[in-house]
């Protein structure tokens, strides 16, 4: 369904919506239960206007104002310490995360097993330990 949408430019319909839901469950969504971190359970204020303007109406083929934005050659201009965290099953592939880590001076990359785009949820306790250790280096 996603390939069909990319080929036809039609990102609508129940089959496409179901495929996107499955994709997001595999690579992004987090569970919400009684043990979920507070950041996952508090009320959200969200909208799609800026996302659609910048990226476009779908996750897979950028058509918005950022579609031609390229920043890889500018990553070395980041001068503050940077912590890059990603999951093995992340929307941000390990290749993308490693590219950032390799090009941002004074950066550290953590690739979490058993984690998706929301590694701060999927590996919450481990994430907090690593984040505090990293922050203490620069405080």
Language model features: what each stretch is:
Residues 23, 69, 93, 134-135:
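Aromatic-residue hotspot detector
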Residues 106-139:
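Catalytic active-site module of serine/aspartate enzymes centered on a nucleophile-bearing elbow/loop
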Residues 65-115:
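Conserved loop-alpha-helix segment in the C-terminal half of the alpha/beta-hydrolase fold
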Residues 46-51, 98, 123-127, 139:
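Short amphipathic alpha-helical patches
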Residues 28, 39-40, 85, 92, ...:
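Generic recognition of cysteine residues
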Residues 2-76, 80:
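Alpha/beta-hydrolase
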Residues 22, 28, 86, 117-118, ...:
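Broad hydrophobic/π-residue packing in well-ordered secondary structure
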């Amino acid at each position: 369904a996603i390939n069909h949408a990319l080929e036809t430019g039609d990102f609508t319909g129940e089959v496409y919506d179901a495929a996107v839901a499955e994709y997001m469950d595999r690579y992004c969504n987090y569970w919400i239960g009684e043990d979920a971190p507070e950041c996952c359970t508090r009320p959200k204020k969200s909208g799609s206007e800026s996302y659609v303007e910048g990226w476009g109406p779908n996750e897979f083929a950028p058509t918005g104002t950022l579609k031609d934005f390229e920043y890889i050659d500018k990553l070395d201009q980041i001068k503050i310490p940077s912590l890059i965290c990603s999951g093995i099953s992340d929307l941000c592939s390990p290749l993308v995360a490693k590219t950032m880590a390799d090009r941002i001076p004074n950066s550290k990359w953590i690739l979490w097993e058993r984690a998706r785009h929301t590694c701060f949820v999927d590996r919450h306790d481990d994430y907090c330990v690593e984040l505090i250790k990293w922050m203490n280096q620069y405080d």
